[in-house]
A protein has these predicted regions:
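Catalytic histidine-centered segment of alpha/beta-hydrolase-like enzymes
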Residues: 252-263
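The serine-hydrolase catalytic nucleophile loop
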Residues: 59-71
Length: 276
């Protein structure tokens, strides 16, 4: 009985420590937990389809709205997707305290390389929500500068307001000196935001990097978003030289919990028109 209990405890300990996990993609903080969703009855050996890399917001996860709904709806349209937890988030390796936008861009670029390596992928699109929108926009710009632009880009309530928050010394309930923040602050009283994040976010060239991407763009923003102001999406529209489209979803909030189906529909229909 004691031996059996010991074996169970040992297994649980190794599982919690992450030794039982296997990662296919790695970012600067380590292995990235990811999930590929394919269209129904899709044969990876003989079929081809486009794929969209889905990026969640700060403190969020690949398993939190709106990411799972996006993946499911894309699959119904014959489009595959990759969703993943950024380094330091949930099931990925790393520590939230050491997360930065720059590191998340590296995570996204690693996912891009993985998507390119999949033999069944025809085209690649990017989608980001909140801070994930900032990451997606800058990743698209970096890729465009390299000569390998994504085929389409969707930004849902892109959270470029993070830069103003860090410069202003207030971030999700945490207050700090922008010029000399502590080692970390606690957002919502529990989530650690590191000094490196606060300082580096102030120096980001968000729009300058994003504008290198000249492919098709759709922005989606809820009219009742109390976290990321509409002006962030409007600034992205002004930044892009191409015809970037902004769709305002009446009554929707930042977390996409009121009009989820409508938001998903706007995103998926855009990808269907651009990738297939």
């Amino acid at each position: 009985m004691l031996k059996r209990l010991y074996l169970i405890l040992t297994f649980l300990t190794f599982s919690l420590l992450g030794f039982s996990k296997e990662y296919k993609v790695y970012g600067p903080q380590g292995g990235l937990a990811m999930e590929v969703t394919l269209p129904d009855n899709f044969n990876v050996d003989t079929d081809r389809c486009p794929i969209v890399i889905l990026m969640h917001g700060i403190f969020s996860s690949k398993n939190i709205v709106p990411i799972p709904a996006m993946a499911k709806a894309l699959a119904k349209e014959g489009i595959a997707s990759i969703c993943f937890d950024f380094g330091g988030h949930w099931k990925s390796e790393g520590d939230m305290e050491y997360m930065t936008v720059g590191k998340e861009i590296e995570d996204a670029l690693a996912m891009w390389e993985h998507a390119k390596s999949l033999p069944y992928v025809s085209k690649i699109g990017l989608l980001g929500h909140s801070q994930g929108g900032v990451v997606a926009s800058m990743t698209a710009g970096i890729l465009a500068a390299r000569g390998e632009s994504p085929a389409a880009l969707v930004l849902v309530a892109p959270g470029s307001v993070i830069q103003d928050a860090c410069k202003g010394g207030r971030f999700f309930g945490a207050e700090f000196s922008p010029a000399d923040p502590p080692e970390y602050v606690k957002c919502f009283g529990i989530m650690k935001l590191g000094r490196e994040y606060i300082l580096s976010t102030q120096e980001l060239d968000i729009y300058g990097t994003a504008k290198a991407y000249t492919g098709p763009v759709r922005l989606i923003h809820g009219s009742k978003d109390s976290i990321v102001p509409m002006s962030c999406s409007e600034k992205f529209v002004e930044t892009y030289t191409q015809d970037a489209e902004l769709i305002v979803v009446e009554g929707e909030n930042h977390m996409i919990t009121k009009k989820l189906k409508r938001v998903v529909s706007h995103a998926v229909s855009f990808f269907a028109s651009q990738l297939k």
